[in-house]
Amino acid sequence: MAKDLNVFDKEYGLLINGEWTKGSEGKLLSSYNPANGDELAKFTDATDADVDAAVVAAQEAFKTWRKTTTAERAAILNKIADVIDENAELFALQETLDNGKPIRETRAADVPLASDHFRYFASVIRGEEGTATQLDAEDLSIVLREPIGVVGQIIPWNFPFLMAAWKIAPALAAGCTIVIHPSSSTSLSLLSFAQKINHLLPKGVLNVITGRGSKSGEYMLHHKGFNKLAFTGSTEVGRRVGIAAAELLIPSTLELGGKSANIFFDDMPFDKALEGAQKGILFNQGQVCCAGSRIFIQEGIYDKFVNALAEEFKKIKVGLPWEDDTQMGSQVNAGQLETILKYVKIGEQEGCRIITGGKKIEGELGKGEFVEPTLIEAGSNEARVAQEEIFGPVATVIKFKTEEEVIKMANDSEYGLGGAVWSTDINRCLRVSNALETGRVWVNCYNRLPAGAPFGGYKTSGIGRETHKMMLAAYTQVKNIYISTREEREGFY
């Protein structure tokens, strides 16, 4: 029985002040299924005036939302999680169609993890406490955390549903109001989600602006109505977001690019490690900021592991992403596919060996943006394919001899987002983990991203941490109330 793929409205507007509007000019953009090129739906191309209206709505809503209790906000977050659970199959299919990732991934990861994040922040916000310190016999210091205000959030195209949850859940929990902007490549799942939860929130608490990043997204960066910016995307754009926030003298949270090292020692758990190497680079077609795109293999097991990994790559079922048995779907758009193929050519020009893959898939999948899982023997960690973020199912394999050598190579990168160590020697795992200059190190696993474990980067991979209660601090500001109980004059004047 064919699966019904008609799961979107024909057109989507903007969510401003609790109402759906076509925007000030009513111009529309189209979203396409990257697996076959079919148009999925149209959505509004917002103007500067639309962003202004959304910010004003958020500012007005903040006056009352900030006064809600943590219990009230926690109850709403749990209700949002209930909506996700009740519509899990719908959201999974919508994310798959709009993004191109396999439905087995959206069912197992994107959607349930989104629900998990709302429940997590509903829980931890109830435990947040201020402090009171008796400084001396007469002076008392009270420290409170208050919501920072209106936050502008910009989310990427690789995990639009999950990244929305990563941004929205802690901001709402902290008592902030939101103007959120998805990528123009993948706006539909957030719009559908907003439709389902709009009735749970007071007007203006959550506002959704869609359109071109170069237009409405750029305007958001410089808007004086925001008290904080939060961005997930490339390091190149992240720099501009950070500069814009600095010019406004407001804080920013930036989750940016990566070129993560997936390190395999001779004593690795072989079969599990083989799967971990695949999960590190093939999950979401390699379009993951923390993808394990640099695979370092110790010399004693190098040939055996590379040969086995190449065979596993060849067996991957690349197919229509909505089919249950598909293991790898399509890239998000033609531009991303072109970038991947460009880097394969760069690798060849540098003298790297293409072990397997490296070509666009034609035939039955020729209408979509499909590429073969690709394994490249880089020879040197200095090769461009080993240093620059490709953002696709392309991994470089590099041989190493010693622990010290691989640590040096792993850290020889401008990025520092993720990484992994595979070994049955726990002391080695801890030594190497401590030595890696990266915000997340997995040990004998990869791409596990539950709420409760902080995620974020070192170096040019970002500023701040998400998926953890410490994110509440990023959406709040500290107030100190200093009380003197002394009744007499101090005698200073």
Where are the language model's segments positioned?
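Conserved C-terminal structural/oligomerization subdomain of aldehyde/semialdehyde dehydrogenase
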Residues: N36-K42, I263, K317, Q349, ...
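Residue-level signal for inorganic ion chemistry
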Residues: G37, R73, E95, F118, ...
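Short, well-ordered beta-strand elements within core beta-sheets of diverse protein domains
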Residues: E39-A46, E60-K67, Q153, N262-F265, ...
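Structural signal for hydrophobic packing residues in well-ordered secondary-structure cores
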Residues: F62, R66, A81-A88, A92, ...
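ALDH superfamily catalytic-core signature
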Residues: E236-S380, V443, E490-F492
